[in-house]
A protein has these predicted regions:
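Nucleic-acid substrate recognition interfaces
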Residues: 1-386
């Protein structure tokens, strides 16, 4: 399994200038290559390299391997852009079908444009232009001003990851600080023998609830989002450069808190699964944002800001590191089905938090009931596979 180890570089002002020049030169080359690729409709890495390598190598003044990495960055960007554009077109076409049924005019289909790269966007280094000295907590990085030996700082977990560092590392400039993001190949432990499933129901009010009764509230996260939303609305009216910077700062703060919260929730979920010797079952929520167009605006906003995919990703990789199997099960009607008798009816869900089966009288928290149903679906999925 591949994981990312992030380390912070400790640089002097002079070294920061050298790194900045390197980013700017590399991204300027990427923009030139991107324009050529778009104009000539050539998007494959090998095709771009064959046609442009020698000329841009002579004109740019960059080392051979940096030019190769820039070509790869452009090719990969177009590959991703074409995939996203295709998905965007499909979503728009589905939306237009729904709008036609309601008698609404169709939305315009998205138009793809040439890929553009920020002056200080990250660039990838491989072993030819970057060397790690983990024991010394030092890296040797190629720049336009020559090789620089830079110390770095990181946590113990990142140090252990760096022992298995392989492949590329990205040089990233973020908020006036320099980071290296190293790809590390971690050996997957064998999957453990489990005794049942721990069902995990994800939500907005309660970010996660498991089938053992543990619940993780999203009240503070939602309050922060509302506060940021209100503040951003007032800043957007001003439209000044200072207001834009404040907007970006608020957005980053909200993102950091959400990521921190999801990390902690996922650690607790995996810990519960390990202690109870269970696999983890979660709902397959793919495409959920496309199915909420009929909901009121407030709920659409809440779902749009719901970071369920990040939380599921964190749970998946942390569970894999512990050898805990993870299964994704069908999501529909888990909140309306009674986990005691199996009766499914919308009237069972009395409110956001209350579940009362109208057939057998079973009463409990609605999220806990859904988590129990998800655990049962995990068992059914495993039985069908066996």
């Amino acid at each position: 399994m591949k994981l990312i180890a992030q380390v912070k570089l400790v640089v002097t002002p002079e070294q920061s200038v050298a790194l900045t020049e390197t980013l700017e030169s590399a991204n300027a080359l990427c923009n030139g290559l991107s324009e050529w690729a778009w104009d000539n409709k050539v998007f494959g890495k090998y095709a771009i390299q064959t046609a442009r390598y020698h000329q841009v190598r002579a004109e740019s003044g960059l080392t051979a391997q940096v030019v190769i990495r820039c070509i790869a960055k452009v090719a990969n960007s177009y590959k991703t852009a074409f995939t996203l554009h295709k998905e965007h077109v499909k979503r728009t076409e589905r939306t237009n079908k729904n709008r036609a049924v309601k008698g609404l005019p169709p939305k315009e289909l998205p138009v793809m444009e040439a890929c553009k790269f920020r002056a200080h966007g990250s660039i990838a280094y491989d072993d030819r232009i970057l060397n790690w000295y983990v024991a010394k907590q030092q890296v040797s990085v190629w720049t336009t001003q020559g090789r620089l030996k830079l110390p770095f700082v990181c946590g113990d977990f990142q140090k252990r990851l760096l022992a298995s560092q392989q492949g590329e590392s990205d040089l990233v400039y973020r908020n006036g600080k320099w980071f290296l993001l190293a790809v590390c190949e971690v050996e997957n432990p064998p999957l453990k023998e489990v005794d049942g499933f721990l069902g995990v129901d994800l939500g907005i009010v309660q970010l996660a609830t498991d089938s053992e009764g543990h619940s993780y509230t999203g009240a503070k996260c939602m309050a922060l989002r509302r506060r940021v939303k209100k503040h951003c609305a007032s800043l957007q009216k001003k439209g000044t450069k200072k207001a834009v910077r404040r907007l970006q700062k608020q957005s980053r703060r909200q993102s950091r808190y959400s990521t921190w919260l999801n990390h902690n929730i996922s650690k607790n979920i995996v810990r519960s699964a390990v202690q109870s010797r269970k696999a983890i079952a979660m709902e397959n929520l793919e495409g959920i944002r496309e199915r909420v167009s009929a909901l009121r605006r407030e709920l659409r906003w809440q779902i749009g800001n719901w970071s369920f995919a990040q939380l599921q990703g964190f749970v998946s990789y942390k569970a894999r590191l512990q050898g805990v199997p993870v299964a994704f099960v069908s999501a529909p009607y888990t909140s309306q089905t009674c986990s005691a008798c199996g009766h499914c009816e919308r009237a069972n869900r009395k409110s956001q938090s209350d579940f009362h089966c109208i057939q057998c009288g079973f009463q409990t928290n609605a999220d806990y009931n859904a988590a129990r149903n998800i655990a049962c679906r995990g068992l059914e999925a495993r039985a069908s596979l066996n």
